[in-house]
Regions:
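Cyclic-nucleotide recognition modules
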Residues: 46-99
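A small-molecule sensor/coupling module
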Residues: 84-123
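Short alpha-helical scaffold segments that flank and stabilize functional sites
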Residues: 35, 71-73, 112
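Regulatory nucleotide-sensing modules
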Residues: 1-37
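Short hydrophobic/aromatic patches on the structural cores and recognition surfaces of FHA
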Residues: 13, 32, 50, 68, ...
């Protein structure tokens, strides 16, 4: 990556960050796969090489709303938020607003997915 970063290695099952953690940095997957999970364990995403995660909390300036866990052994680049913030500060305000809006919608969609998953689990348990 062209940003200031630190290479991190995680073994399968390692937690990279948990719900409620401060959103300090974002991550770029170099190798392996990362599972993004809700507070009740619903897998909201399965990310692989070249994908970024951890950006939502930074963009909307809130604590982590999901848990990121290594699904396989993996190498990720922890990207310094300061460098990304400079890019956002220099970006077209319309693009920044779109990015923030999309990030908020991702959070809302994750909450809705978990709610529906929990309701489905209750219905299945009644069968």
């Amino acid at each position: 990556p062209k940003f200031k970063h630190k290479q991190l290695k995680f073994n399968e099952g390692n937690v990279i960050y948990s719900i409620g953690d401060e959103a300090k940095n974002v991550y770029l997957i170099h190798s392996g796969h990362i599972s993004i999970r809700s507070k009740h364990g619903l897998e909201l995403g399965n990310l692989g090489p070249g994908e970024i995660f951890g950006e939502v909390g930074r963009v909307i300036n809130s604590p982590r709303t999901v848990t990121a866990k290594a699904k396989t052994d993996c190498i990720v680049y922890e990207i310094d938020w300061g460098n990304l913030q400079k890019k956002l500060d220099e970006a077209d305000p319309v693009l920044v607003a779109i990015t923030r809006g999309l990030s908020l919608r991702i959070g809302d969609a994750n909450e809705l997915a978990e709610k529906l998953w929990l309701e489905l689990s209750v219905y299945k348990s009644l069968e």
